[in-house]
């Protein structure tokens, strides 16, 4: 299996799917989006068509097109493009996995099906194995997010012996606040053979202390630069500085959570900070209110998080 020599590590932006005001995918801005992540945020890995990308609100055809555009625009700019291929049925997941391999993606990830749910570890692994087999040469990651799937199988239980059953398994995106479960995953990963990517942005420093090898999150789209500074401080064993960065990031996330924070609000914040129009979410999600956007902007300013191109004196400039 021709897996990349460099493991997936560091920050991975869970990308937004840009849309027009009438709900169609806005493909022309994806190239600009890639450049913004790399040049302004220092983020060179992406996770496409996940929760933040509204992957499960897109048609299979749209998911294929979105994946193709990110791979095309990211060529020679991004380090790794991981495509989420999870779906509610096996055949669609297999189709998307095979397509990801055909277009040159660097890896695939799969969420647990959440209508008809796996009742135990063996059933879930059987599903994951069949998806992975559709693209055996691609690194395979399990996307663990029990708060949305309702699948309560612990990640540390799943990891036990998984590579014997799924040879392409390379790690997991752990989007849960259960640090005991995550710590046990790290404890199993003695030889660091797996990428253990933490997915709760406001708890990242805690996960780094436990041994996270990287992170996948929505805030790295617009707070990647600040989070990278936290990673650098942590690597240099400057815990005081790392804590300072984490607390500032937490202040913002805590504030917007209290206002009501999700995919819709992430789109509004990314539009505000980057100047790239992300558009509204797709129904049933509702567009973020102007009040939310104004409050989020004020908080970003108070934390000095708005010093990015595309903004001038706090006001968004038109983007070409």
Swiss-Prot record:
Its main location: cytoplasm. Its EC number is 4.1.3.3. GO terms for biological process: N-acetylneuraminate catabolic process. Keywords: Carbohydrate metabolism, Cytoplasm, Lyase, Schiff base. The active site is at 143 (proton donor), 173 (schiff-base intermediate with substrate). It holds the Pfam family DHDPS. GO terms for cellular component: cytoplasm. It is found in: Cytoplasm. One of its GO terms (molecular function) is identical protein binding. Aceneuramate binds at residues 51-52, 175, 199, 201-202, 218. It catalyses: aceneuramate = aldehydo-N-acetyl-D-mannosamine + pyruvate. Catalyzes the cleavage of N-acetylneuraminic acid (sialic acid) to form pyruvate and N-acetylmannosamine via a Schiff base intermediate. It prevents sialic acids from being recycled and returning to the cell surface. Involved in the N-glycolylneuraminic acid (Neu5Gc) degradation pathway. Belongs to the DapA family. NanA subfamily. This is N-acetylneuraminate lyase. The lineage of its organism: Eukaryota, Metazoa, Chordata, Craniata, Vertebrata. The gene is Npl.
């Amino acid at each position: 299996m021709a897996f990349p020599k460099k493991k997936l590590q560091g920050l991975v932006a869970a990308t937004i799917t840009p849309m027009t005001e009438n709900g169609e995918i806005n493909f022309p801005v994806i190239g600009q989006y890639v450049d913004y992540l790399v040049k302004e945020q220092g983020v060179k890995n992406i996770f496409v068509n996940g929760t933040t990308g509204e992957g499960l609100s897109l048609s299979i055809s749209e998911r294929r097109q979105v994946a193709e555009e990110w791979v095309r625009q990211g060529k020679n700019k991004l380090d790794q493009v991981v495509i989420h291929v999870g779906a509610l049925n096996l055949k669609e997941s297999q189709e998307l996995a095979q397509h990801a391999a055909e277009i040159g993606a660097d890896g695939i990830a799969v969420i647990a099906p959440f209508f008809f749910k796996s009742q135990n570890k063996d059933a879930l692994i059987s599903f994951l194995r069949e998806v992975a087999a559709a693209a055996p040469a691609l690194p395979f990651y399990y996307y663990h997010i029990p708060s949305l799937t309702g699948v309560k199988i612990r990640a540390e239980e799943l990891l036990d012996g998984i590579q014997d059953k799924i040879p392409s398994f390379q790690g997991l995106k752990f989007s849960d606040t259960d640090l005991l479960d995550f710590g046990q995953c790290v404890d199993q990963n003695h030889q660091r053979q797996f990428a253990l990517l933490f997915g709760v942005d406001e708890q990242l420093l805690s996960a780094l202390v436990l041994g996270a090898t990287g992170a996948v999150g929505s805030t790295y789209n617009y707070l990647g630069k600040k989070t990278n500074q936290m990673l650098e401080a942590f690597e240099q064993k400057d815990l005081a500085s790392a804590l300072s960065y984490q607390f500032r990031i937490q202040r913002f996330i805590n504030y917007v959570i209290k206002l009501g924070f999700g995919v819709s609000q992430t789109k509004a914040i990314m539009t505000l900070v980057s100047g790239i129009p992300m558009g509204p979410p797709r129904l049933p999600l509702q567009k973020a209110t102007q009040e939310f956007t104004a409050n989020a902007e004020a908080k970003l300013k108070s934390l000095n998080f708005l010093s990015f191109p595309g903004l001038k004196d706090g006001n968004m400039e038109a983007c070409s």
